[in-house]
Amino acid sequence: MAMKSQKAKPISNKSKLERSPIEMEVVSHLKQLQGEHAIAVGLSGGVDSSLTAALLVEAGWKVEGLTLWLMEGKGSCCTEGLVDAAGICEQLKIPHHVVDERSTFQKEVVENLVNGYQEGITPLPCSRCNRFVKFSPMINWARKNRNLKRIATGHYARIKHAETNKLNSLDERKNRHQLLRGIDQNKDQSYFLYDLSQEILGHVVFPLGALTKSFTRKEANRYGLRTANKKESQDLCLAEKHGSMKAFLNNYLPPRKGEIVLTDGLVVGEHDGIEHFTIGQRKGLGIAWKEPLHVINIQPSLNRVIVGPRDQSGRSNCTVGEVNWVSISAPMQERLVEVQVRYRSDPVKAKLVPIEPTIKDIKNNRPHRCRIEFENPQFSISPGQAAVFYKGEVVLGGGIIQPFEY
């Protein structure tokens, strides 16, 4: 599919003396990767994916740009993003391909998100989009249509690829591709990537994993990339398109009034739909009370939101389903891990206890489930969000926090 693009400036010439030590290290690493140096770069039209493509070109790779068209409108993966991605490919003098994934995005992300909110949970659309819409379709399209066996994206994470010549080693770490946090702690996106399979990780490269966001901006400007100073989205793409998450949900779900109650059943307010609430939420409840109230639980069957003081929302454990084990195989025994239950939250110490999977886990081809026992009570644990397990910087695995009762 051909897209019209604005006239782009040619990429700036850079001598080796102008390169920073960090950039030289990244380029050197890319040059040393085994296999044919031909790759498709997932271009969203933002600065991160733009620099990813530029670094690969600098490292001497045969690069082709690949953009997924997910929806109409402004923003990355929308019509506006396609134009910027095409402009970057023009600057870098590389081919640009657009793949229409709007129907897949609608089914796997939009419908799943709306259904989740109806069920009183807070889904994590970014990880689902990565698993079902972005990585697998890009890998399959690049392999089938361009005979390219690798893809690269601008995610801030790292992959330590398996030592293919030691696949029979007793050392499990050498038998699996490992997913690691990005160097930039403020930008690390490994939390959203826990759901990627070993097969996918084997075909993926993350050139920005060793860089910081500020360095990326600086380098993009030095390259003269047209997206170097493009404003970064601060919200979910669907919320950005519609102006807010509430506006997005209002397009799909009509208002349905219900009660807001305390944990003892006392009615303290009214709401227009449980989909506008998430556990731990304090702002926007529309309730004047003698003390701050937080959402403690959501009961979809009763169309009811339960609120209370923050100390009533603490949990010592939670169940995690549809678990994907990334850097290790599924543990058969209890083990100590660090768990991150929200994107911007700090990892906390916990004990992971394997338990029997449900039929849903098995049907979703994720036959693993576990109970997480926190060292200290945790607040604002939201069903539908991901619980991702770490050991230091290594992503062990992760899954979906399951609904619970108070």
UniProtKB/Swiss-Prot annotation:
GO terms for molecular function: ATP binding; tRNA binding; tRNA-uridine 2-sulfurtransferase activity. Signal peptide: none annotated. Its main location: cytoplasm. ATP binds at G42, L43, S44, G45, G46, V47, D48, S49, L68, G154. Disulfide bonds join C129-C237. The keyword Electron transport does not apply. Its EC number is 2.8.1.13. Gene3D superfamilies: Adenine nucleotide alpha hydrolases-like domains, HUPs, Translation factors. Keywords: ATP-binding, Cytoplasm, Disulfide bond, Nucleotide-binding, RNA-binding, Transferase, tRNA processing, tRNA-binding. The record marks H155, Q385 as: Interaction with tRNA. It is found in: Cytoplasm. GO terms for biological process: tRNA wobble position uridine thiolation. The active site is at C129 (nucleophile), C237 (cysteine persulfide intermediate). SUPFAM superfamilies: Adenine nucleotide alpha hydrolases-like. GO terms for cellular component: cytoplasm. It comes from the Bacteria. It catalyses: S-sulfanyl-L-cysteinyl-[protein] + uridine(34) in tRNA + AH2 + ATP = 2-thiouridine(34) in tRNA + L-cysteinyl-[protein] + A + AMP + diphosphate + H(+). Residues 187-189, 342-343 are annotated as: Interaction with tRNA. It is an enzyme of class 2 (transferase). InterPro entries: MnmA-like, MnmA-like_C, MnmA-like_central, MnmA-like_central_sf, Rossmann-like_a/b/a_fold. Catalyzes the 2-thiolation of uridine at the wobble position (U34) of tRNA, leading to the formation of s(2)U34. Belongs to the MnmA/TRMU family. HAMAP family: tRNA_thiouridyl_MnmA. This is tRNA-specific 2-thiouridylase MnmA.
